[in-house]
Amino acid sequence: PHRIESDTETMPGLGLLPMQTVMQKEKVTRQVRFTLAGATGAGQGYEIHNGTTLPVEGETYTPFTRLEDGTPEGSISGSRCVGTYIHGILDNPSVIDWLVAPYAGKKAVSSPDYAAYKEEQYNKLADHVRSHLNMPLIYQILTAHD
């Protein structure tokens, strides 16, 4: 209704989930913590969107996650279709474990610690950058007083 980023007033969705989204004037940007429906453990990510998504009137839905404040978030249909506003959701081991479980059979499978892996990669990048810069000069510039 507010014609955010387009002159289009309405547009049909794919029809995969019993949800409808209404665009809002204000963009939501926030860090969130959540629990995954049907899984153990908590996760975190961030939201960045202009919409409010609610179930289509008369339809039932299953929330995909529940935010830390108890608010249901996202939607899941069966085991093959999920919708969520949470960016970075696949960085959470509990989500990866949940996604892989139906295909792992009876094998005990657990995902690697992706956050630790990312931290390790950032440290490698920082070491590489430091090795090619005059760090004493940079620190001198940063601590110089006018």
Q: What is each stretch, according to the model?
A:
Residues 1-44:
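Cysteine-nucleophile active-site neighborhood
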Residues 6-9, 67, 81-82:
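Short, functionally important structural connectors and interaction interfaces within domains
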Residues 16, 45-47, 81-85:
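Conserved beta-strand scaffold positions in the cores of enzyme catalytic domains, especially
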Residues 16-22, 53, 104, 108:
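Non-catalytic alpha-helical coupling and interface elements of nucleotide-dependent molecular machines
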Residues 21-22, 50-55, 88-91:
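Short, glycine-/Ser/Thr-/acidic-enriched flexible segments
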Residues 26-28, 57-60, 93-98:
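Short conserved micro-motifs at the rims of enzyme active sites and ligand-binding pockets
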Residues 36-79:
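Catalytic beta-strand/loop cores that center a nucleophilic Ser/Cys/Thr
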